[in-house]
Amino acid sequence: MDDSIGVKRHWIWQGAFVLILAGVITKILSAVYRVPFQNIVGDVGFYIYQQVYPFLGIAVMLSTSGFPVIISKLMNDYSEKNHHTILKISALFLSLIGILLFLCLYLGAVPIALFMGDSHLAVLIQVAAYAFLLFPFVALLRGGFQGRHEMLPSALSQMTEQFLRVAVLLGLSFWLVKKGASLYTAGAAAASGSLAGSLVALIILGFFWFKTKRDNQTDRQNENVITTKELTKKLLLYSVTICVSSLLLLFIQLVDALNLYALLSGGEASEEAKCLKGIYDRGQPLLQLGSVFAVSIATSLVPYISMAVKNKELKIMKEKITSSLKLCLVLGTGASAGLICILKPVNIMLFQNGEGTGALQVFSCSILFASLAVTAAAVLQGAGYTVFPAIAVGAGVAVKWVLNTLLVPRYGIEGASLATAASFAAVAGLNLYQLRQKEWLDKLRGVLIPIIGSALLMSAVLLAYTRLWTFLFPATGRGAAVIESLSAVAIGGAVFIYCMMRLGIFTDEELNSVPFGSKLSKFMRRREQNGG
């Protein structure tokens, strides 16, 4: 019995690693491609694409970390004999949702665009609507594979989908801008990249599915039939809870898409407001890059924690939860503090100028809060508490909408950045409060002061370094900004890691579970033995 549990745990962690790797690669690509895209189309073109990106992103997330998680959870909750019924009912359920969302977006494109304050966006919204016709099939197949702990097809399809999406987006936008096409046409072409990526992902998943189908036949005559009513209830519940929680970052972006331009422009068409919204949207790739590891870890936590709860391994579950939250806190704090200190050269390096640096520094605080919010939500979901994280997301979206309305008319994009940080902080605070009520945060108290101290020391070093650089090299071109930014990242990262190692924030076991952690541990032990 113990051996079978051990083997199962091994397969779960091996599969989780595959999905973590795929998630890291796809999220890095999702953040990085926006830099050359902004360089191609400019701030106004970036604004146009970002207005419809939340719709595209929602379709991608539903087919990647929303419904696949739900389907795999259902397959793990019920015996293998019920898997065929689960997949059949899920297929019908997802198809209905996909058609409904498509019709709402496609038929409502003009009213939505008018609500946003830019009627030219209607065509782009209609293009984005087609993504919801493809997502049900992609989500179903990914969920089926993940429910059988076969992570390779899901991971491979994710990476291929993202590579193709980026290639089509950049290629078409570059070609159209070079030809002199309008930025709205380039934006619509860029949005079509998501459709191409989803179609190829579906082909890859279909190939693996039909290839393995014969090896996974079950005896349906002895099938323990689950009622349609029972499964539909669970699908509806999980759709509102798990899916809503996974869409936190996109919902916050959706609020900005719906009301930020209108608030900046005062309800009138304004090129300046479009440019400001595009500058503000520079913060999105920074947020994604800064939180990519925490978000990827959070996604992989759900099936493991569910298995630990199912096997009543509560001590192991609590240890893994503590380690994951600690890692999230460290990565989020370091990324937020470091980026705030070097934001000006990073802004010039990535986006060609330093416009909006102050607003983006405020926005950078969101990295820590978003990382904590997503990771804490995943922990709660894995432990079976799926409703509360969804409520927290709803509260965060409400905070964002209200603060945008109050702050943007007075403070512009700085107010929008503050509203974003506050909304993520609200979600993180609610989820962490719930974890505290479960007594799962006790071991984190002792590491807060060392982490804050490490971040403050790193910030002091970075601020001194950037001032020294400005004094020695007054040039403000993009080439100088690249050298300053990359060298500052190396220096700040080294200082932060060294402080954490010296203060013993992580145990040897925790270090051995992260990339290069064991080498860092050995390096620090050698220094201590040599009197360093």
Curated annotation (Swiss-Prot):
Keywords: Cell membrane, Membrane, Transmembrane, Transmembrane helix
Positions of transmembrane segments: 25-45, 65-85, 109-129, 134-154, 179-199, 203-223, 248-268, 302-322, 344-364, 371-391, 392-412, 425-445, 459-479, 494-514
Name used for this protein in its record: Uncharacterized membrane protein YabM
Subcellular location: Cell membrane
Cross-referenced InterPro entries: PG_synth_SpoVB (IPR024923), Poly_Biosynth_Transport (IPR050833), Polysacc_synth (IPR002797)
GN (gene name): yabM
CC annotations in GO: plasma membrane
Pfam families found in the cross-reference section: Polysacc_synt (PF01943)
Annotated signal peptide: none
